[in-house]
Curated annotation (Swiss-Prot):
Role noted for this protein: This is one of the proteins that bind and probably mediate the attachment of the 5S RNA into the large ribosomal subunit, where it forms part of the central protuberance.
Record's keyword terms, sorted: Ribonucleoprotein, Ribosomal protein, RNA-binding, rRNA-binding
CDD domains: Ribosomal_L18_L5e
Basic residues: bias regions: 10-20
Taxonomic lineage from the root: Bacteria, Bacillati, Bacillota, Bacilli, Bacillales
Chain spans, region Disordered: 1-24
Protein name as it appears in the record: Large ribosomal subunit protein uL18
Origin: domain of life: Bacteria
GO cellular component terms given for this protein: cytosolic large ribosomal subunit
Family affiliation: Belongs to the universal ribosomal protein uL18 family.
A GO BP entry: translation
Oligomer status and interactors: Part of the 50S ribosomal subunit; part of the 5S rRNA/L5/L18/L25 subcomplex. Contacts the 5S and 23S rRNAs.
GO molecular function: 5S rRNA binding; structural constituent of ribosome
Length: 119
């Protein structure tokens, strides 16, 4: 009998493959996206120093509405772009975290682009 692979395990393998090819620096950090059933998270990471420069999530105080829909992802994209601008970061490397570029991940990326991040 053929056993079906766990979706999350497949995503993690895909993410590891992508991560072997991309990394962030202080000048051009990695914009990492993590999606859960209840929330969405974004971080700007300097992989050379191993430091998170800026982060945003739908769990933060002051965030209203559902935490894990397309509208929430758009708000997080705007927030991460504004916080990056405060730290004088304009260019990033996008890391979709092994997720398909669709739905919440796409909404976050497009909102970040519209608010000044280049990738």
């Amino acid at each position: 009998m053929i056993t079906k692979q766990d979706k999350n395990q497949v995503r993690k393998k895909r993410h590891a493959r992508v991560r072997s090819k991309i990394s962030g620096t202080a000048e051009r950090p990695r914009l990492n996206v993590f999606r859960s059933n209840k929330n969405i998270y974004a971080q700007l990471i300097d992989d050379v120093a191993g430091v998170t420069i800026v982060s945003a999530s739908s769990q933060e105080n002051g965030f209203e509405g559902a935490g894990s829909n397309v509208e929430a992802a758009s708000k997080i994209g705007e927030t991460i772009a504004k916080r990056a601008a405060e730290k004088n970061i304009t260019a990033v490397v996008f890391d979709r975290g092994g997720y398909l570029y669709h739905g919440r991940v796409k909404a976050l990326a497009e909102a970040a682009r519209e608010n000044g991040l280049e990738f």
